[in-house]
Amino acid sequence: SKIALDNLAHEIALAIRETQVFGVASKEATAGSSIFPTRGAHFDKNQNTSFVLFVDVDDNNKYGGPSELIETFNIQRRNYISEICGYATPSSNCTPLDLLDLTFTRPNPEPAVVGRVGTSEALYSYATITITSPKGISRNIVIWSNGQIAIQ
């Protein structure tokens, strides 16, 4: 239903926002280490009914697999991620992405927006994640370069 899709869009936006908060206000990895781990959210077009929150252990602004996993969010009710877009500039068109990593590093609330198409990787100004219901209703979660997260 439309309400369930709206709720899902808000859940995804909230998960990204929590990742942002934990990344910006993170504790030291080990007391006294002065190492503050980057946090991120990972979206994969081929895993379109889930997404991952992670700690960027190797500090490369992308998800490195199970050793970096914090939590996997499963998308319910046959809703799915139908499109992931990267935008090089605020006025550019969508570049459809295979993978998207949004990472937040203390003290900056602005995300690093890293997208991949095949083996080609690029930094983007901002990104959108489109979720779609079985009835074809869609919502966009927009992650702006200034750290704002919106639902359209």
For the regions a language model picked out, list residue spans one by one.
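N-terminal helix-rich module
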Residues: S1-V21, A25-Q152
